[in-house]
Amino acid sequence: MKKILLVLALLLVVAAATFLIFTEKNHGGSGRKTAYDAYAKGDYQTAYEIWLTSADKDSAAQYGLGKLYANGQGVAQSDSTARDWWQKSMRDIEQSRVLLSILPDPSDPQYTYATLHEKWQPAAAAGDADAQYKLAILYSTGIGVPQNDTKALVWFEKAANQNHAAAQYELGKFHEYKRGRCAAAQAIQWWEKASALGNADAQNILALRYDMGFHLTPHYPRDECRAIALREQAAAQGHPEAQTWLAQTYMYDQPQCNLVANRDKARALLEQAIANGGEHTRKQAESVLYALEHNGRYPTP
């Protein structure tokens, strides 16, 4: 019973964080909706003012400000300022982490965010998988080019078919989040490929699907032991969310998976997640750590 309550409580925390990420991506929340609506209409000044007001606490606003500065929309274009905002939000906003991983240092005079498309296009057209992936990111985020999901999908597929793990992970997200449940099997297939190549994000998202059966087709039944194995791989690479979930697994024996409870390991994983995770992951890990130290009881909100 304790294990069930622990899992349910953790799921509530994860659901809240997932909802926040989903609403950030889909213009949810009154303030965010107003800012994103203004952005979509080309009213960049209004979007800027709204995002700036909440930027001290809102990572989604920080991401939005970075986009404005990168594209010079409503503000003076500044690659370095865009990068600064994305660095503030990178622990909570996946798009910020992805952009920071592909964009060159603003101090390099040979590159500006506005000209990256024309610099990467020839290599992408010639079949370079990394350039194809980078172009797809530009199109999917709308940095330096108009946001275009159709073009993003084309380049993600080209890179993914060349075993580019990050492109495979992004392509899986595209299938599930853009196309919905009908494409869940395709999403999982791409995540499986990325996971086999060592992509920690793919390992983590696959673990969640196998653990809870979210969107799984009959061809992909629930598999707790597979979920644990995937989280072990992702956690070993320092993935904070995987570390948090794996920690709660180690709080109790899992005989069906030949796993013996190890509260010391659980505590170590949670401490790593708290040190390295974003705001939502840190809160989740802190909640589980409290439960670990208080016989499964979670803190009162």
Range-by-range predicted roles:
Residues 42-46, 76-85, 108-119, 146-155, ...:
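Structural signature of tandem alpha-helical TPR/SEL1-like repeats
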Residues 37-38, 53-54, 64-71, 99-106, ...:
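Hydrophobic face of amphipathic alpha-helices that form TPR/SEL1-like repeat modules
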Residues 8-19:
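Hydrophobic membrane-insertion alpha-helices, especially the h-region
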